[in-house]
Amino acid sequence: MTTQNAITWPERYLPGTGDNFVSNEVVVAGLSAADVWRRLVDTSRWESYYDNVADIGFPQGGGPVLTDGIHFSFGTFGFPPLDAHVVEFQVPAEDTPGRLSWTAKQHGTPEERLDVLHAWLVEDLPGGRVRVLTQETQIGRPAAALATERPNPMLNGHQAWLDGLIGAAAE
């Protein structure tokens, strides 16, 4: 029997306490956590395998590869570019999952404000398999509105991101 690793959640973003939460996961054979990680942290590749992201920028310099503490911005789900900040960054290693989390914010009126934590976990599994888990908690009125849409655009969008990421890692 095995126990799987989980996302590390700051109190503010605990699943079920915000206005919108989704979780997506894939487990595939024939790839490693290192294969996936390279594609995930390189934002210059995102638009080649995920069509729900645009306008990626690094207003304080750095990039396009994400690193611990870096600030960046990107547009997604019809929102203008969100101010994002990497708050967790752990490269996958033997017996250690890769962990990447960023906060993203949209400022403005209460009707416009959005506060997000998007977390990723990338880990090697026995038998030459890799597991990729992505979860996101959103807080704010735009998040509450997004949560009521069917089909769920965030759930489907993140699944498309996972599928594209796995396809890019397999190239």
Predicted regions and their residues:
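Generic structural detector for well-ordered beta-strands
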Residues: 25-29, 57, 73, 85, ...
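Hydrophobic pocket/interface hotspot
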Residues: 35-40, 46, 70-72, 86, ...
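Short Pro/Gly-enriched beta-strand edge/turn motifs at strand-loop
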Residues: 6-10, 65-70, 99-106
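Hydrophobic-ligand binding "helix-grip"
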Residues: 48, 77-129, 137-139, 168
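A conserved amphipathic terminal alpha-helix motif
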Residues: 5-6, 131-133, 137-171
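Hydrophobic ligand-binding cavity/cleft-lining segments
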Residues: 1-63
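Short, well-structured hydrophobic secondary-structure segments
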Residues: 68-79
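A structure-centric feature marking long, well-folded core domains of fungal metabolic enzymes
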Residues: 66-70, 123, 128-132, 143, ...
